[in-house]
Amino acid sequence: MTNAPPATPKIGFVSLGCPKALVDSEQILTQLRAEGYDTAKSYDGADLVIVNTCGFIDAAVQESLDAIGEALHENGRVIVTGCLGAKKDANGDDIIQKVHPKVLAVTGPHALGEVMDAVHLHMPKPHAPFLDLLPPQGIKLTPKHFAYLKISEGCNHRCSFCIIPSMRGDLVSRPIADVMMEAENLFKAGVKELLVISQDTSAYGVDIKFRMGFWNGKPVKTHMTQLVEALGELAAPYGAWVRLHYVYPYPHVDAIIPMMAEGKILPYLDVPLQHAHPDVLKRMKRPASGEKNIERIQAWRAMCPDLTIRSTFIAGFPGETEAEFEYLLDFLKEAEIDRLGCFAYSPVEGATANDLPNAVPEEVREERRGRVMLLQEEISKKRLQAKVGKTMRVLIDEVNRTGAATARSGADAPEIDGVVYVKAPYEPHIKYKVGEFVDVKITGADAHDLWAEA
């Protein structure tokens, strides 16, 4: 009688945080699968659990600590990675080890090697790597029709409200050939929307002095504009979208707008402006000013009238006066940002902004955030209403039992923007499919979403 082969080790996985952290999770899962580990769908079925954490704001820290605690309670064998793993408390002690001393190991973000070393220590490899079992694009946690493409790690900025550089380090750009190869594999796998992400997409290549690389036998500089142009050319035969996130308004961004106007990439810019008043921006240690940003936005829209601009702002930053806040409101009225997120300032442990004088009371911070969002609702409603009657291409995300679909236009990034609700086809033989493009006519709008029919 032959002995049954040993059971394949199973790893549970919890992924928290931003799209950059999601990409880290995808890389870890890809490596686990390459080495023969299986993934478990529940704590009970896992031999150990990996928790990828977020540590940017206090709420994220608490969510991560709660997730670690749950994994320890339900499973007991937990490896922790991610931004919270690199974070210390006021005394310089490891936050995770202090709260959860029973975790098996703790690493910082973007630490594939360290995570795998910890896995090997507590759950040895089941067999030699089976790389041929993996799809070329690796394992993805997003739906099959869209994916995140991380082009760099870390950030060279030292914004006073942010601790990301202390957790993820300075900017490190990926070789452009590696980025292009991953993009090609994703398109070949059926991805219809590629979301380019980093901490600072505009700074791509700065750390390596825009070194010349090669793709398909041609020289391509490690620079944002050349990368975007190459991605647009690569996406064209697949009819796929390329969407840019975390774009700082450096001068060379102007060169990308004509590519958007020509349809090479989506006319969509995610630009984290944070504020408009020059004194507040100075305290934040942020570049540019409201006046300069207004000029840039107006110039961009002149070049590409269909441009959608998304941004985030902070209300109630330390020292923000009522006059400075009113300045921000005036800026928003003039800029008419299409998609906007606003956060009431929240102190982050380790951020230099904590030492700034004249903290704004919490109730005032929340009240100002509310005023920003109320104004933005009016702006968004006006801009979306202007789309009624127009025809646009949308990407189907979901189809319900009635045949109606939830989709997104080029103006809508997944999870953070609005959606387009598409009426079921009139012809019963026509069925929408997730991941396909459909041309629709916009029939209605509110402050967030659109309604349409094919």
Curated annotation (Swiss-Prot):
Its EC number is 2.8.4.4. [4Fe-4S] cluster 2 binds at C155, C159, C162. It catalyses: L-aspartate(89)-[ribosomal protein uS12]-hydrogen + (sulfur carrier)-SH + AH2 + 2 S-adenosyl-L-methionine = 3-methylsulfanyl-L-aspartate(89)-[ribosomal protein uS12]-hydrogen + (sulfur carrier)-H + 5'-deoxyadenosine + L-methionine + A + S-adenosyl-L-homocysteine + 2 H(+). It is found in: Cytoplasm. Residues 9-124 form the MTTase N-terminal domain. [4Fe-4S] cluster 1 binds at C18, C54, C83. GO terms for biological process: tRNA modification. Residues 385-454 form the TRAM domain. One of its GO terms (molecular function) is metal ion binding. Keywords: 4Fe-4S, Cytoplasm, Iron, Iron-sulfur, Metal-binding, S-adenosyl-L-methionine, Transferase. Its cofactor is [4Fe-4S] cluster. Its main location: cytoplasm. It comes from the Bacteria. Residues 141-382 form the Radical SAM core domain. Belongs to the methylthiotransferase family. RimO subfamily. Catalyzes the methylthiolation of an aspartic acid residue of ribosomal protein uS12. This is Ribosomal protein uS12 methylthiotransferase RimO. The gene is rimO.
